[in-house]
Amino acid sequence: MTRIKRGSIARARRTKIRFFASKFRGSHSRLTRTIIQQGLRAFVSSQRDRHKKKRDFRRLWITRLNAAIRAIGVGYSYSASIHNLYKSQLILNRKILTQIAISNRNCLYMISNEILKSGV
């Protein structure tokens, strides 16, 4: 069998990796080993932070919703309103409720009154 020289293939692979790391600083964009390590680290960080973003936004929605609900009624909390929301079988998630609370406080007031009136 003939010998296969992989110079062009290896160069193409490294060029592709370098293109991804061209935005990095210092040796992280110049040295192949470091580029590979930093690339893996970047992918791990991006995946981790995508999941973290979901948690952060849920926390933000809950905080905003709690503040809006407490402003509406005395002694009425976020947890009680979400519990009553599920009992009355209304299909509104936290994101939608928060958008309603920010844009139209009266609408949120009407929704919470309906939930309390149903008294399931």
Swiss-Prot record:
User: Which PROSITE patterns is this protein grouped with?
Assistant: RIBOSOMAL_L20
Cellular component terms, GO, for this chain's entry?
Answer: plastid; ribonucleoprotein complex; ribosome
Entry keyword Signal: no
* Any matching Pfam family: Ribosomal_L20
Q: Which CDD domains match?
A: Ribosomal_L20
Q: Where in the cell is it found?
A: Plastid
Report the domain of life of the source organism. Eukaryota
- List keywords of the entry alphabetically: Plastid, Ribonucleoprotein, Ribosomal protein, RNA-binding, rRNA-binding
UniProt GO BP: translation
Residue ranges annotated as transmembrane are none
* Primary localization class, coarse: plastid
Recorded GO MF terms: rRNA binding; structural constituent of ribosome
Instruction: Please explain the role this protein plays, according to its UniProt record.
Output: Binds directly to 23S ribosomal RNA and is necessary for the in vitro assembly process of the 50S ribosomal subunit. It is not involved in the protein synthesizing functions of that subunit.
Q: Give the family per the record.
A: Belongs to the bacterial ribosomal protein bL20 family.
Query: NCBIfam families this protein is in?
Result: rplT_bact
Can you say what this protein is called? Large ribosomal subunit protein bL20c
Taxonomic lineage? Eukaryota, Viridiplantae, Streptophyta, Embryophyta, Tracheophyta
Annotated gene:
rpl20
